[in-house]
A protein has these predicted regions:
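Signature of multi-pass transmembrane helix bundles
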Residues: 1-40, 62-155
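Interfacial/capping segments of alpha-helical transmembrane domains
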Residues: 41-67
Length: 155
């Protein structure tokens, strides 16, 4: 009885699943995130090292590495999660460039230019200008995905 249920579900869902798997944008997004997974795993390990819930762990690490030991481990975390959108842009642009048979480097550069054009420039009270890194973290993923797909499509 269960086999017949799964067979019927397979018959109903297979056409939809094959259409979804053939979509170039979903494939590009999938490949972009697959490429980012090792970076995310490494960043997660460093974040884990800063917050292990064992009694005496913080004191041990402070004794070994000094008062600001957690900041040492947060640098790799910020370089992975903090700029995750940049890594995803490279993966998506690369995948779409292969699909359209255009130059990969040019597609990545065009995508970066589009992302930077949409990123607001912050001006501090001192008059210093800079890009907010929050837009390149996980909170900027949606904008990065849409912008990259559009930029490579137009390119």
């Amino acid at each position: 009885m269960m086999n017949s249920f799964f067979d019927k579900m397979g018959e109903k869902l297979m056409p939809f699943a094959s259409k979804v798997s053939a979509n170039r944008y979903l494939n590009a997004i999938k490949e972009g995130f697959f490429g980012v997974m090792p970076v995310i795993i490494v960043g997660s390990l460093f974040l884990l090292f800063t917050s292990i819930p064992i009694n005496g762990y913080n004191e041990l690490m402070t004794g070994l590495l000094g008062e600001n030991w957690s900041q040492i481990f947060m640098v790799p975390y910020r370089m992975s999660y903090g700029i995750m959108s940049i890594y995803v842009v490279v993966g998506i642009a690369r995948s779409l460039a292969h699909f359209y048979k255009v130059d990969t480097r040019e597609s990545i550069v065009v995508s970066f230019i589009a992302i930077f054009m949409l990123t607001p420039v912050l001006v501090t009270e001192d008059g210093l200008k800079g890009l907010p890194l929050d837009n390149f973290s996980a909170s900027g993923l949606f904008l990065a995905i849409i912008t990259t797909c559009l930029a490579v499509e137009i390119f």
